[in-house]
A protein has these predicted regions:
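Short, charged helix-capping/linker segments at alpha-helix termini
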Residues: 1-9, 19-38, 48-56, 148-149, ...
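Hydrophobic/aromatic residues within well-ordered alpha-helical segments
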Residues: 11-14, 66
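Hydrophobic-face residues of short alpha-helical interaction/recognition segments
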Residues: 18, 22, 62, 66-74
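C-terminal flanking helix
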Residues: 19, 26, 42, 159-166
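Structural recognition of an alpha-helix C-terminal capping motif at a helix-to-coil junction
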Residues: 36-43, 56-68
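DNA major-groove recognition helix of helix-turn-helix
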Residues: 38, 49, 66, 74, ...
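Arg/Lys-rich amphipathic alpha helix in sigma70-family domain 2
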Residues: 67-85, 164
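Amphipathic helix-loop-helix modules that constitute alpha-helical solenoid scaffolds
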Residues: 85-139, 146-183
Length: 183
């Protein structure tokens, strides 16, 4: 498998897991950051792997590169300077490779966060398909026969509501679970 095909495969099958893990570690208010740094890591893989070779565990490499990029960006953000120690404390959770059950728990928590009842159903669906399933904005728009700009706006508004309502990626309580599963 050539590098381009491998990176495409990793994007389709691992990017949601990495986004979920980073969102758990850095908090749901940094969902945009998690998505951006995963894309940065995939780009770095495309740039480096053809020359340096594919690492033994490509998904772990992507996670580490994305985590390090997120830390770099957060450290340089003046408004988050007070959070630097908190972020450093979260690092041990990523130090050892997560088991597949941890990754599944993170993905489920991400899906349940995307399906928070504070978000309109259209936002929940678009955000889940984009963030947890890895579909592009264009793919989501085609599936729902909706203009791509509409889907893009739903995603922006959904992420803004998550940030503004301080919605966390933790699993919901037993009372809140049915409302999210219905979504």
């Amino acid at each position: 498998m050539n590098t381009d095909s491998l990176v495409d495969h990793l994007f389709r099958h691992h990017s949601a897991k990495i986004v979920a893990t980073l969102t758990r570690v850095f908090g749901s208010r940094h969902l945009d950051l998690a998505e951006d740094v995963v894309q940065d890591a995939l780009l770095k893989a495309l740039q480096q792997w053809p020359f340096k070779g594919v690492p033994e565990n490509p998904a772990a490499w992507l996670t580490l590169v994305a985590r390090n990029r997120a830390l770099d960006l957060l450290r340089h953000d003046a408004t988050l300077a007070s959070k630097a120690q908190e972020l450093e404390l979260a690092l041990p959770r990523l130090a050892s490779p997560a088991s597949s059950s941890d990754e599944m728990d993170d993905q489920l928590a991400l899906i349940l966060m995307c399906c928070h009842p504070a978000l309109p159903l259209e936002y929940q669906i678009a955000l889940t398909l984009k963030t947890a399933c890895g579909f592009s904005t264009a793919e989501i728009a085609r599936a729902f026969l909706t203009p791509q700009t509409t889907v893009a706006q739903r995603l922006v508004r959904a992420k803004r509501q998550i940030r503004d309502h301080d919605i966390v990626i933790d699993p919901p309580s037993a009372d809140d679970l049915p409302a999210r599963i219905d979504s």
